[in-house]
Amino acid sequence: MSAANIAVKVVSLLFVPFLNKILGGEAGYSVYYSANQVFAFVYVLTTAGLPVAISKLVTELTSTGNRKQAKQAFRMARTLMVLLGIVLSVIMAIFAKPIARYMNNEDSWMGILTLAPTVLICSLLSAYRGYLQGMKNMTPTAVSQVVEQIVHVAVSVVLVLGLRSRGIVWAVAGASIGTAVGAAAALIIVIKYYGQYQQDQRVLHAGEDLRSVPKLTNEKLLKLILYYSLPITINSGIQYGGNMIDTSIMKGRLMAAGLSEYDSRTLHGMMGVTRQLLNVPTALVTSLCISLLPVIAGLYAQKKYAETRQKANYAFKLCYIIAVPLSIAMCVYAEPLYVMLGLGSGAKLLSYMSFSILLLGTVHLQSSVMQSVNELFSATLFMGIGVLVKAILNYILIAIPSLNIYGAVISTYVSYIIPLILNHICLVRKRGVRIKMFRLTLIPMICGGLMLVGSMPVYLLSDFLLGKFAGTYVTETISLILAAAAGIVVYFYAMKKTGGMDSSDFSLILPANLRKKLKL
């Protein structure tokens, strides 16, 4: 799964600048980003909680030998997801133009309309993924994710190039159709895996007597599905709803600061590109630690509180081992990264926003730990407070001419710091889980500084030498790659020598062949 996640995120990272370019720059990307924010909000309402509920219920029921009811729970949740997907798809399609007006980007209506069927497809897709993950079969999810992203990118590029002569509205629609086709391809794959898996299970358990296995009523199954799914859905809905509100506010407040509509759309698109770039490392950071969370939940349920604290701190340790150097590197090397990816302006914005990787990674992990110790309602409340404060600050700060788009940077940091502090207080006071954040970030920060000391001379020397005969793109790209390689080696060696990482940490983060070459 982790290798598939990395592959998907790399493809996604490369797709953003390419799409930005073929849509005509940040102003065109702003239209796509607005449509995509609407889709992201509706998508999490249908797929954030119910697949988790399916996975959890299927795991619990199969562990007690109740495979028949595990399948029944899956079918029940799948029906709910399909019904919800149909309703939300129809709402998106019917109200595409009013929603686009609310988003303050009327050209995005066609993108919203063409994304509507994707909600239903993804609802069904997530149901099958949840079931197969609950049966401990991760291969279908991994394979389908990679295929989905490749098909999405390929179809989107072809359609955008074919339709952009008809204007930005149609070009964005082409990109949105690519999303639907990618999801449909993934759905075909998981259904095929599901069918084969069911056939194998029938052969494996033929003639098995299930009469002695305790059974749950349909009402009880439904209650469990809702109990497991609703808190996660609400939490994700608040977060993505906040992003949608930000998107609707931003362009209007930039115009209130005295900027033209085109300049406002350009800056809005610039922020969209920056956030999409930051989403990639943030997702990698959180996915690295997420496997520890069921262990934390199990330890807490068994009242092993000391071990719960230990595992929670270890999850944060892994988070900071990756998040700290990524934040530092994106801050310092934002300019050459933008050149390498073929993006226009916006490197300064990425540099200022880079440490949101660290903060958002922390908040996501805190929310997951709080879910594990039965404090998800509190985590949701604190996230909601952060979203509300962010919307208010965006409204005020973005309209200040001297700040404009950088007002959104300030509000972003504040919106993460608020739930971070409140989550920490809640975990310590109510559950006795103290995360030693300062201590856990100290060594990665020191080693991150050493990483810069090792990588910056490599970058500057390469930039100087190549600059004499090569163009800007080649010079910056090669210099950045060499600096990154030097920085990675220096960072991990420094972490080993300072005791920041041991062999078990390296085995979780680096492939075996790379560990062998670096002697880590």
Where on the chain are the PLM-derived regions?
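Alpha-helical transmembrane segments of multi-pass membrane proteins
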Residues: N105-A127, L341-Q366, L381
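Interfacial/gating helices of multi-pass transporter permease domains
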Residues: L19-F41, I168, V172-A173, K220-Y228, ...
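Membrane-interface junctions at transmembrane-helix termini in multi-pass inner-membrane proteins
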Residues: S123-S144, F355-I385, I396
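Signature of the first transmembrane helix
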Residues: M1-V52, S89, A93, T118-V119, ...
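Helix-loop junctions and terminal segments of transmembrane helices
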Residues: A48-S63, T274, T282-K303, F316
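Short membrane-interface helical motifs at transmembrane helix boundaries
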Residues: V87-D107, P325-L343
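Membrane-proximal transmembrane or re-entrant/amphipathic helices at the cytosolic face
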Residues: Y459-L520
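C-terminal transmembrane helix end/exit motif
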Residues: L159-L163, V181-P214, S415-F464, V489-D505
